[in-house]
Curated annotation (Swiss-Prot):
<keyword id="KW-0975">Bacterial flagellum</keyword>
<comment type="similarity">
    <text>Belongs to the FliE family.</text>
</comment>
<protein>
    <recommendedName>
        <fullName>Flagellar hook-basal body complex protein FliE</fullName>
    </recommendedName>
</protein>
<dbReference type="GO" id="GO:0003774">
    <property type="term" value="F:cytoskeletal motor activity"/>
</dbReference>
<dbReference type="GO" id="GO:0071973">
    <property type="term" value="P:bacterial-type flagellum-dependent cell motility"/>
</dbReference>
<dbReference type="InterPro" id="IPR001624">
    <property type="entry name" value="FliE"/>
</dbReference>
<dbReference type="GO" id="GO:0005198">
    <property type="term" value="F:structural molecule activity"/>
</dbReference>
<dbReference type="GO" id="GO:0009425">
    <property type="term" value="C:bacterial-type flagellum basal body"/>
</dbReference>
<dbReference type="Pfam" id="PF02049">
    <property type="entry name" value="FliE"/>
</dbReference>
Amino acid sequence: MAAIQGIEGVISQLQATAMAARGQDTHSQSTVSFAGQLHAALDRISDRQTAARVQAEKFTLGEPGIALNDVMADMQKASVSMQMGIQVRNKLVAAYQEVMSMQV
């Protein structure tokens, strides 16, 4: 969590510098934080995995209206979402490490 806070701090400093260079007030920036966006994305990934698991359980129990192709498609969507989340995390960690290794 400290890495996310560090990245968020660097991003907010860069945004403030960019706004100051453009002559804008730094207090008028949006209130959506990087950590908030990241948390929302992780929640969506979790929701997609939960929905796929529930649908697979319903199919296994033989509930009517649940087709195998729908279950497989939802499970694949959940898998792709998870892989995307892992890749985003890897890119964030690499960017954070690069910023931290910069000399001031």
